[in-house]
Structure formats: C-alpha cells, structure tokens
C-alpha cells in the first residue's frame, strides 16, 4: 500500500512540476513582446530568443533601462527599412547593454524574406550595439550580414507610416520619436 501511495505522490509531483514549467514558458513567451510607442502610433515586436539569445538579451536589457525612450528614427529609406536606436540621432552612436560591441548571431534558419523583421544595424561583422532596423520589404541581400531577432506582430501600418515620412538624405524632416519602449505585460 505504501508503495502505491509513494508512486502516486511521485506522479502528482511530476505532473505539477511539468505544469509549472509550461506556465513559466508561456509567461516568458508573453514577456518577449516589446511595445515601441512612437509619436505616430505603437509597434509590437515578438522577440526571437531561440534564434538570437544574446541579441534579445541586449535589446530587452536596453528596453528595461529605458535606453530607447526619446530616441528618434534617424534613418528611413522607402522600400527598405526604418532605423533607430542611436541616442545621438546621427547613426554613429549607441552602445550595447555591456558597453561594447558584441558578436553577430546570424542564422541560416531565418532570412530577410518578408517585411516587418527586426534586426541589428551594424558597421560590419560583430559590431552590434544598440541600433536596430525594421524591414519594410523583403531584403535577401542582408541574409547572414545582420542578426534578425524579432518580428512585428502589430503596428506594421505604423512602420509603413514611418517609412512614408518625408526625408532629406534618408533622415525624416519631422522627428519621428520613440516615446517609450517596454515589455508588453
């Protein structure tokens, strides 16, 4: 009899532990949505920690430090992408969560095959910092050159609105600002 009770207790405990793990995974998945509030509307992005864990850690860490709050989209190119994440607003600034550049996490399992992909802007291999871009069209020439780490799940109309802004030398004439960025709760 004691053996049966022990076996049943083990089964129940195992089930409860597995249930807790599933709930934790679901909570983590929910928390990997980041909202970027702009002066033109909100963009929601699902991060891809399974594809680019260090890049997602960097981005989410900067989001949680309010690093992107008040930063402009400094580069907008029609039929290509919108770019932000540089606190100087020049395209030449921005540091990673760790204060230095970090390595690419390019994977052949993801590609620039559609609009709405979030990727790291860089100045060459392994020069990732804080700058990112969102594609507005498929951009296959960027495959294996920039780390893809997220995808727009809501607000692609806002991305397109930003893309359509009047620019001078790829810089919006009127400021398009990230008011704040935060994990969706």
Regions inferred by a protein language model and the residue ranges of each:
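Cyclophilin-like peptidyl-prolyl cis-trans isomerases
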Residues: 2, 6-7, 11, 18-185
């Amino acid at each position: 009899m004691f053996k049966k009770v022990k076996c049943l207790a083990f089964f129940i405990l195992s089930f409860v532990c597995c249930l807790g793990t599933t709930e934790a995974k679901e909570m983590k998945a929910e928390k990997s949505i980041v909202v970027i509030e702009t002066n033109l509307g909100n963009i929601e992005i699902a991060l891809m920690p399974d594809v680019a864990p260090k890049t997602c850690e960097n981005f989410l860490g900067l989001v949680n430090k309010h690093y992107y709050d008040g930063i402009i989209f400094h580069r907008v190119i029609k039929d290509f992408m919108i770019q932000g994440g540089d606190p100087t607003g020049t395209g030449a600034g921005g540091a990673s969560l760790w204060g230095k550049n970090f390595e690419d996490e390019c994977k052949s399992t993801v590609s620039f095959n559609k609009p709405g992909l979030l990727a790291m802007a860089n100045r060459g291999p392994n020069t990732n910092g804080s700058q990112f871009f969102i594609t507005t069209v498929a951009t296959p020439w960027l495959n294996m050159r920039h780390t893809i780490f997220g995808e727009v799940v809501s607000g692609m109309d806002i991305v397109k609105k930003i893309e359509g802004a009047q620019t001078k030398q790829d810089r919006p004439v009127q400021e398009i600002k990230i008011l704040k960025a935060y994990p969706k709760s």
